């Protein structure tokens, strides 16, 4: 029997890189409400006392960038100089320019379905049946831990009133013959007020954050727990570390369980295939696994700038496929339109759906409908995390002729 360990990590919404991601996606969402045809590539940097917003945006929309940036920072929990960063008083610097017309001529077409890719690149999508979310277990649990930290921190009359926004979690899983069997180690570091004693912090974090999340079936006597192992984490957030958009691409995706093409997501409108195609191939891989065609599936797609059709589509099921990989590839080509316009239409991506994805992972989330008011005063219904639907699983299974 083969045995090995695998580790993934996640970070909280208060981590400086995630603060930057959320600001970038908040800007994107605010623009899409007013201008669905906008081209947005918004980058953010946060450091002590300042948020810098830069990038290339072409739009007819007007957004109060300063007010929006401050709101995101305050909503996360950075609302006082006591915690090291105050969204109400920090400086906000706007360095946004327009998207190059050279890119526009490669993307925009008279016929929408001929829309070219906004850049060259390669993207990967992945799914596994080891969790209900079709995500690798280590990253799934890591996300839930930092999500629980924020939930407890923001709770009225919180049992842990000394929690601060910055936090990180890490899970090490033991696999036996390729199947997750036990949690070998748990690491959780959370920013805190200076008055809390380490012993009290460890006990409270175990009870309020770890216990509600960790699957008891995978815990054992040998599971190692490292809670704030340095003994002190008072200075955090943008004071402790400079935060930049797009620096947590492994946290955003599969925790290292699958390959990554290198492109970040936040702040990019869906004409950028770095984002939209990554969402599409997650949708593809998840439906392949949900259909029972494989236990694990990784799909790669690649593009050339200005060209609509993908340059390549490839499938790997790591020996878990119930049908050959080349047959799965043919089914993918038959049932999924992976041209940029096809992806946008298939997943209904031109809506303000992106800020929630900027923390706790872009994948493994539950699709949810919500309504918003567009610039004309009309009510619009959209679906956040539409790429997590498994609405193609049944037809894939039928066409694969699996019983």
Swiss-Prot record:
Keyword ATP-binding assigned: yes
Enzyme class (EC, first level): transferase
Major location category of this protein: cytoplasm
Subcellular compartments: Cytoplasm
Binding site for L-methionine: 56, 99, 241, 272
Binding-site residues for ATP, renumbered to this chain: 15, 166-168, 232-233, 241, 247-248, 264, 268
Annotated binding of K(+), by residue: 43
Keywords for this protein: ATP-binding, Cytoplasm, Magnesium, Metal-binding, Nucleotide-binding, One-carbon metabolism, Potassium, Transferase
Catalytic activity: L-methionine + ATP + H2O = S-adenosyl-L-methionine + phosphate + diphosphate
Metabolic or biological pathway, per its Swiss-Prot or TrEMBL entry: Amino-acid biosynthesis; S-adenosyl-L-methionine biosynthesis; S-adenosyl-L-methionine from L-methionine: step 1/1
Cofactor field: Mg(2+); K(+)
Sample GO molecular function, one term: magnesium ion binding
Record: residues binding Mg(2+): 17
Chain positions covered by the region annotation Flexible loop: 99-109
GO CC terms in record: cytoplasm
Signal peptide start-end: none
Cofactor binding summary note: Binds 2 divalent ions per subunit.
EC number: 2.5.1.6
Origin: domain of life: Bacteria
Pfam family membership, one: S-AdoMet_synt_C
GO biological process, one term: one-carbon metabolic process
PANTHER family in UniProt: S-ADENOSYLMETHIONINE SYNTHETASE (PTHR11964)
Similarity comment text for this entry: Belongs to the AdoMet synthase family.
Protein task: Catalyzes the formation of S-adenosylmethionine (AdoMet) from methionine and ATP. The overall synthetic reaction is composed of two sequential steps, AdoMet formation and the subsequent tripolyphosphate hydrolysis which occurs prior to release of AdoMet from the enzyme.
Subunit structure: Homotetramer; dimer of dimers.
Name of the featured protein: S-adenosylmethionine synthase
Organism: Xylella fastidiosa (strain M12)
The gene coding this protein: metK
